[in-house]
Amino acid sequence: MLYPLTFQPIFKERIWGGRNLERLYAKPLPAEVPIGESWEITDRPEGVSAIANGSLADKDLRWLMENHAQDLLGTGRENTERFPLLVKILDARATLSVQVHPPSTVARQLGGEPKTEMWFIADAAPGAEIFVGLKRGVTRAGFERHLKSSTVAECLHRVPVQAGDAMFLPSGRLHAIGGGLVIFEIQQNSDTTYRVFDWNRVGLDGKPRDLHVEPALASINFDDAEPRLISSIYSRNPVLSVRYLVDDPLFRVDGCKVKRGQRFHLRSDALQIIGLLKGRLKISHEAAEVELTPGQFCLLPACLGRVTLLAEMHIEFLQVQTS
């Protein structure tokens, strides 16, 4: 019954957002609104993805989880209450707040949810940077002093980035996205975020945005000093070149490149998600067929087994698998 699935994006207005999702990926953004997030695959109270293709186009991801969890996720994974991942594209016209997601132990104490995630830089303005972790030697006491004097930026580890760079962000890692970046974000299905510093600016309502200083301080890993970008090395293969990005108990992400005209196959007993970065890709399984353009995602249910892909142009894509 299931087949390769695409979904309608859900757009989120953010004060730091822009219009790059329209420019780069022809997303149908609402007019004159700063859109910071496109939720591409989501099963949350704040937004559930509606299926966009095929015979199930009147259903959504929540319906799939309630009625076809085993086919979707794979045997042994069907008892998951919610879909395990949240997939977004972020457009940061301006720098985001300095924030942290709580580790599982802290999340339980505070009533939130842990969130581990990874960023893949899809587009970057000259001089763009991300803030990840702390400078070496920064202590909690020193960090709190900088908070009081609004000089937190002096504590943050800055990393210059360009398109193609990637960063892993386990729960507890302090971070902020700099302005001028478009990012494909793969994350644990959670939306608990504690803002600790917001660059002394105001929100869409003209008032300073709420900060969550105490929960943030309890969540930050103060031993997390100067983390590095993920390796940019691809394997050498005449058909499918692979770059191993993340191999975590929550999810695995690989970056893949395929030359124009190559036909290849993917097989897994767990669900997979394909996110196209460049080119044009055709995905087929039995009679079902999906064509992806950059900025689109396709969910491959676990029950499909082998799926055929055709690179209609030179393609680059992310392959996401649940563990």
Model features per residue range: what roles?
Residues L156-F168, V182, E286-L304:
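Short acidic-glycine-tyrosine-enriched beta hairpin
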Residues I121-F143, V242-V246, V258-A270:
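Short beta-strand/loop turn elements enriched in aromatics
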Residues M1-V138, D198-S231, V253:
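Transition-metal
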Residues V87-K88, L96, E117-F120, R158-V159, ...:
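His/acidic/aromatic-lined binding-pocket segments of jelly-roll/cupin-type domains
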Residues T80-R82, L90-T95, P114, A124-G127, ...:
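Ligand-binding loop in jelly-roll beta-barrel domains
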Residues F131-E154, I183-A225, M313-S323:
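Double-stranded beta-helix
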